[in-house]
C-alpha cells in the first residue's frame, strides 16, 4: 500500500508544481471565451455554456492540489484555506454587486430593483444557486432579466470549497494511502454523476443549479491531480492527451446548444476534455499564446462583468441587435480588465498583510454591508416612489395575477388540485395550460354570483390534447408529466361526462416557439408520433390542428364544449416594456397587427372552425375585445393588459367577462351549438 509523502518526494510531472501553470491559465481562456460569446449570441458558440464546466474542473484540480500539499506538509489551516478562497472571490464580487445596487436606484423599476436586491443578497451569501433553482419555472422572469444569474456557479464552487477540505481531512485521519484517497473521491464523483444524469431527466432545474449534481465535475479535477502525481508521459503522448482534451472541449462548444438537456451525460464531454488538458500539463501554442494568457488572468473579472453587460442590453431592448452585442463583448473585456487591475490585484495585496482576524473582518464587513443594503431593497419592494405613479402602476401589472395561481395551477407532477370556484357544485371545467390560470377569475366572475361552479384543470406548458409530447422535456418537465396530467384530466372529465368544458391555451407557442421582439422562431415544441419536427411545416400544423379538432369533437359527444380563440401574444413583456418606455419619456405603445396574429394563429382558428362545423362546439372570441381596426394593443388607457408576453393580467382578463358570460346564458330555442361568441 503506497503512502502519501510530501510533493517534493514524489515523481511529479508539473501537476503538483508550485510554479505558475501557464497551461491552466490558458485553459481558463478556453473556458471564459465560449461562455461570453455564447451569451452574446455569437454564431458557432451554441454550446459555449460548457465553459462553466471547464471552470469547475480547473477549480477542483487546484483546490485538491492546494489542500493535499498542506496536509502532506502538516500545515493545513481550514480557516486559512477558506480565507484564501474569500480573498480570491469576494472583493470583485462585492464591487459588481455594489455597482449594480447603486445604479439600480436610478435606473430600475421597483419590481426589477426588488429582484436585484434579493439576488444580490443571495449572491453575496453564496446561495444564489439555490435561489435560482427555486425560482425556475414557467412564470419565472426570463433569464436575461436577472443581473446576477451567473453567480450560481460561484455559489456552487464556494459550497464545494466548504466541503472538500472536510472530506480530505477526514480521509487523512483514516488513511495515508493516496490510492485510497483517489478511490474515495472517485466513488463520490460516481455518485454525483449518477445523480446528475438521473436528475437532469427528472428535475432539470435542480440538476443544473445544485451542488450534488455538479460536484463530480470538480471532483474530476481533483482526481486528475492525484493521478498526475506519479504519471509520466513522453512529449508525444502529452501532446496527444492535450490535443484530445482540446478537441473534446471544442466539440462540446460546437455540438451542443441551449436545447440540449444539461448537464446530464453530455457534460462528460467538456469535463473529460478539461481533465485531459490538465493531465497533459503541457505548455503549447493553444494555451500558452499571449491572448490566452491575457484573457486567462482576467477570466474571473470578465465572467463577473459580462453578464450584467448583456442584461443591460436586454433591459434597453437591444439583445438582438448585432452592433450592440459586439459593443457589449468589448465593454465586457474592458470592464473585466479594469476589475482585474484595480480590484482583484490590489485587494489580494492589501489582504495579504493584516492579521487573520482583520482580513476576515474586512471581507465579511464589505460583503455584509452590500448584502444588507440589497436586502433592504428587497424588503421595501424595490423602493417604490422613485418614479412617476403611472410608471409604477404599469410595472405593477407584472404581479397583477390571480392570487390563487400558485395554489391551483400545476407545474410538476401529473395531477392538479382541481380548484373549485364559485359555489360547491361543479358546473364547468376549464382545461388547458397557463392561459387558463390567467383567465380563470374572469370566467368565475362571468357566472352567477356564488354559483359559477368552475373547476380549474391547468398545467404549465401543456394544453389538453391527449397524445401530445414535448420536444424539450428539460424545459417544461419530462414528457410523462404533461402526458400524465392529460391522462389524469381526461379521467376527471370522463367522471362527469355531461358537464361543459372550456378549452384554452397558447397553441402558437407549441407550434412555432416563442414570439419575441426582433426574433422569429419557427421550431415546434411538441410532437405527436414518430420523430419531432425540426421546423414548423404546413404538414405539422395540419397534424396539430387535426389533434386539436379531434380532442374537442370527442369531448362534444356528451357535453357542450367551448373553445377560446388564442389570446394575442405580444413581442415583449408588456409591464416591463411599457413602464420602462414611460420612465424614459418614450412612446410606450406596444401592439401586434391582426395579420401578425393570424400568421401564428390562423391554423388554430381553422381547427376550431372545423370542430364547430363538425361537432357543434362553441367558440369564444376575445379578439373582438382586445383588437380594433386591425391592431391588438397591449394596453388600454395606458394600462397594461398583460402580466408578461402573453398572459393577461387581472385587469386585462376582466375585459373578457362579457365573452365568458355567454357560457352561462341559456341556449336559444332549437340551438345545438356551432356558434362563435364575441363581445366588444
Each language-model region and where it sits:
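Extracellular/periplasmic envelope-modification machinery, especially enzymes
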Residues: 2-6, 258, 318-324, 328, ...
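Membrane-interface helix/loop caps of multi-pass membrane proteins
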Residues: 2-355, 679
Amino acid at each position: 500500500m503506497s503512502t502519501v509523502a510530501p510533493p517534493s518526494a514524489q515523481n511529479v510531472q508539473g501537476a503538483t508544481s508550485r510554479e505558475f501553470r501557464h497551461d491552466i491559465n490558458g485553459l481558463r481562456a478556453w473556458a471564459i471565451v465560449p461562455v461570453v460569446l455564447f451569451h452574446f449570441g455569437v454564431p458557432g458558440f451554441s454550446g459555449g455554456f460548457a465553459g462553466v464546466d471547464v471552470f469547475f474542473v480547473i477549480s477542483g484540480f487546484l483546490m485538491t492540489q492546494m489542500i493535499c500539499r498542506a496536509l502532506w506538509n502538516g500545515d493545513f489551516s481550514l480557516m486559512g484555506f477558506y480565507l484564501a478562497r474569500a480573498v480570491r472571490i469576494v472583493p470583485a464580487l462585492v464591487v459588481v454587486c455594489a455597482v449594480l445596487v447603486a445604479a439600480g436606484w436610478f435606473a430600475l423599476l421597483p419590481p426589477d430593483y426588488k429582484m436585484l436586491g434579493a439576488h444580490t443578497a443571495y449572491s453575496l451569501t453564496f446561495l444564489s444557486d439555490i435561489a435560482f433553482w427555486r425560482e425556475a419555472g414557467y412564470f419565472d422572469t426570463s433569464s436575461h432579466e436577472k443581473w446576477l444569474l451567473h453567480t450560481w456557479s460561484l455559489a456552487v464552487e464556494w459550497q464545494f470549497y466548504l466541503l472538500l477540505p472536510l472530506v480530505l481531512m477526514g480521509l487523512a485521519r483514516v488513511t495515508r494511502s493516496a490510492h485510497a484517497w483517489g478511490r474515495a473521491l472517485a466513488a463520490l464523483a460516481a455518485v454525483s454523476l449518477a445523480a446528475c444524469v438521473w436528475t437532469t431527466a427528472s428535475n432539470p432545474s435542480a440538476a443544473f443549479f445544485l451542488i450534488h449534481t455538479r460536484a463530480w465535475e470538480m471532483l474530476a479535477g481533483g482526481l486528475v491531480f492525484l493521478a498526475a502525481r506519479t504519471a509520466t508521459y513522453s512529449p508525444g503522448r502529452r501532446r496527444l492527451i492535450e490535443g484530445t482534451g482540446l478537441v473534446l472541449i471544442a466539440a462540446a462548444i460546437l455540438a451542443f446548444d441551449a436545447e440540449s438537456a444539461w448537464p446530464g451525460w453530455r457534460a462528460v464531454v467538456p469535463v473529460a476534455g478539461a481533465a485531459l488538458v490538465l493531465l497533459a500539463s503541457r505548455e503549447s501554442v493553444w494555451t500558452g499564446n499571449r491572448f490566452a494568457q491575457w484573457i486567462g488572468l482576467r477570466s474571473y473579472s470578465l465572467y463577473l462583468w459580462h453578464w450584467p453587460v448583456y442584461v443591460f442590453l436586454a433591459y434597453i431592448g437591444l439583445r438582438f441587435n448585432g452592433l450592440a452585442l459586439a459593443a457589449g463583448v468589448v465593454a465586457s473585456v474592458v470592464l473585466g480588465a479594469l476589475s482585474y487591475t484595480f480590484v482583484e490585484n490590489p485587494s489580494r495585496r492589501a489582504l495579504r498583510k493584516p492579521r487573520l482576524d482583520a482580513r476576515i473582518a474586512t471581507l465579511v464587513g464589505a460583503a455584509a454591508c452590500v448584502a444588507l443594503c440589497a436586502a433592504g431593497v428587497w424588503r421595501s419592494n424595490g423602493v417604490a416612489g422613485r418614479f412617476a405613479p403611472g410608471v409604477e402602476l404599469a410595472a405593477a401589472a407584472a404581479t397583477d395575477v390571480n392570487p390563487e395561481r400558485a395554489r391551483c395551477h400545476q407545474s410538476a407532477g401529473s395531477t392538479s388540485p382541481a380548484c373549485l370556484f364559485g359555489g360547491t357544485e361543479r358546473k364547468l371545467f376549464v382545461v388547458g395550460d397557463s392561459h387558463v390560470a390567467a383567465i380563470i377569475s374572469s370566467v368565475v366572475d362571468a357566472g352567477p354570483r356564488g354559483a359559477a361552479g368552475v373547476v380549474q384543470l391547468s398545467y404549465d406548458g401543456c394544453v389538453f390534447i391527449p397524445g401530445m409530447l414535448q420536444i424539450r422535456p428539460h424545459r417544461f418537465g419530462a414528457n410523462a408529466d404533461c402526458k400524465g396530467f392529460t391522462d389524469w384530466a381526461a379521467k376527471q372529465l370522463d367522471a362527469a361526462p355531461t358537464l361543459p368544458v372550456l378549452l384554452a391555451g397558447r397553441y402558437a407557442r407549441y407550434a412555432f416557439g416563442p414570439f419575441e421582439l426582433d426574433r422569429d422562431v419557427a421550431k415546434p415544441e411538441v410532437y405527436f408520433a414518430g420523430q419531432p419536427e425540426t421546423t414548423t411545416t404546413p404538414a405539422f400544423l395540419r397534424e396539430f390542428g387535426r389533434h386539436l379538432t379531434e380532442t374537442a369533437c370527442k369531448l362534444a359527444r356528451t357535453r357542450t364544449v367551448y373553445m377560446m380563440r388564442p389570446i394575442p401574444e405580444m413581442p415583449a413583456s408588456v409591464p416591463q416594456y411599457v413602464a420602462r418606455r414611460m420612465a424614459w419619456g418614450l412612446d410606450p405603445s406596444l401592439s401586434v397587427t391582426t395579420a401578425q396574429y393570424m400568421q401564428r394563429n390562423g391554423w388554430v382558428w381553422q381547427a376550431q372552425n372545423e370542430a364547430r362545423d363538425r361537432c357543434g362546439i362553441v367558440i369564444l372570441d376575445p379578439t373582438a375585445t382586445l383588437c380594433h381596426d386591425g391592431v391588438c394593443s397591449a394596453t388600454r388607457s395606458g394600462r397594461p393588459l398583460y402580466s408578461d408576453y402573453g398572459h393577461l393580467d387581472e385587469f386585462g382578463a376582466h375585459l373578457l367577462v362579457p365573452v365568458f358570460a355567454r357560457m352561462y346564458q341559456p341556449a336559444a330555442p332549437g340551438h345545438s351549438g356551432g356558434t362563435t361568441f364575441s363581445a366588444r
